[in-house]
Amino acid sequence: MTAILVQQQHNVETSPKRKADESLQMARRAIASTVDAMDKHLLAVNNGIHSHPELCYQEVFAHATIADFLESQGFKAQRHAYGLDTSFEAEAGSGGRLVIFCAEYDALPDIGHGCGHNLIATASIAAFVGAASALLALGIAGRVRILGTPAEEGGGGKVKLIDAGAFSDDVSAALMCHAMPAHQVKDGKAGIAAFRTLASRRLGMEFFGKNAHAGQEPWSGINALDAAVSTYTTVSMLRQQIKPHQRVQGVIEEGGKVPNIIPDYTRMAWGVRSFSSSEADALSERVEACANGAAKASGCTVKITRAIPYKELRVNEALSATYVSEMVSLAKDVLYEDDEPSSAGTDMGNVSHVVPSFHGIFAIPTLPGVPCHNRAFADAAGTPEAHREAVEAGKGMAMVATRILEDADLAAKVKYDFRRRSG
């Protein structure tokens, strides 16, 4: 009799866990079957965006392609969302908590999708439709939303969406995944969960001088190219005194037309990165001081324009750990975190300061030594193998979202991690 009572007590104690495990398995099956069934359509969307690269805030084709696809699957897509022409939004479910999937799709000048944003869009679309099917299968309250986030490449699209109210207080999590060359992920892992990035600043500099004949009467000119070259040189010397994790990169976008005319106008662009926003701001001031000094020395005037600042990406431990565990169920061994933060910057960092956020990494095959922001990486981002990795990452994110919506304890842990990081 005692043994029977013990067994009955054991059954009572384990049944909630067994029920939860069964729900998770049901959700995984629903996500996998739904996403796999529409894979050829996802591939068409992915290939279409990849073959039509568009710069920030000009993503007309990508915007229409994704919105059309969502509507073809029975979702209502709100185009031109939050006052941005190339943003969109669609939602599934009702009541409960809310999880957002962020879809990027802008490209780079000259090299197309050298950052693989077509794959980011594909992963988030797969995550959204997969999570929507899981909500139906489980019959639980909760909402998932896909948000088109244009202009990550310097345009600060997510920052504008934050200001417009897209990431409100009722958002339990915002999720996305980014592609990375496989050789940059150590130990042959399939990706990185707790991915960290630097705060970044972008500066535009214009120098104004005076034209003159460079051979006949150079003393009558004020050389704007001298100011730009001097700025570049002094910043290069400044790099000796910056911290190892800090980055300063610059280019001369316009430096004159012909050598026999002293340039009266030149233009530069700079990127500044550091661990924190305060460090990035301080380093930016030092770069600006180089420009001001160069302008004064050459007799030019300078105009400095500051782009929307990107904040450092805050990691959410609960979201990252959940993603790692869910990728195991997809036979993907994902690294929890790398030893050092990436030197990249993203406007998802700004989102991570507003709501709990996840910015995972999935590895894609490339030629040896190929980095991001490279034409060869753009080629790799258009392969079937890269598409497959994006879709698998999407399935993982779909399960993370489902678990947040289904499990109040996990949702509380996610919120706790966010508040702890927010200080």
Regions found by a protein language model. Give the residues of each.
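Non-cysteine beta-strand/loop elements that form the S-adenosyl-L-methionine
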Residues: I100-C102, L203-F208, H359-I364
